[in-house]
Amino acid sequence: MTQGMYYIISETTEDRFDEVESLEEALRIARDVVKESQAGDPVSIEHNGRVIRQFVLTPDGEVEEEPVQ
């Protein structure tokens, strides 16, 4: 992983969907990816080796941000 990059990762499958240089772009991509996921499967944004944001699709089709542990 390159320092300073933001990585969009499925926490369920551990697939890496993309890597980008800006948080804004990472947020957009993560929300798009989670919309295509199954309800309850978290999609995370990692930066400098840490999960900084996490999103999940609710059963009613809404994207929600979850607290990062």
Regions found by a protein language model. Give the residues of each.
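A short, charged, amphipathic alpha-helix used as a generic interaction element across diverse proteins
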Residues: S10-E11, V20-P42
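A general secondary-structure boundary signal
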Residues: Y7, S22, E65-P67
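Short, mixed-charge low-complexity intrinsically disordered segments
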Residues: E36-Q69
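Amphipathic alpha-helical interaction segments
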Residues: E14-D15, E25, V63
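N-terminal targeting leader peptides, primarily classical Sec-type signal peptides for secretion
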Residues: M1-M5, A30-V34, G49, Q69
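Short aromatic-glycine-(Arg/Gly/Cys) micro-motifs in beta-strand/loop hairpins
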Residues: M1-R16
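Compositionally biased, intrinsically disordered low-complexity regions enriched in proline and serine
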Residues: Y7-I8, D18, N48, V56
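Surface-exposed loop/edge segments in extracytoplasmic proteins
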Residues: T13-V20, V51-R53
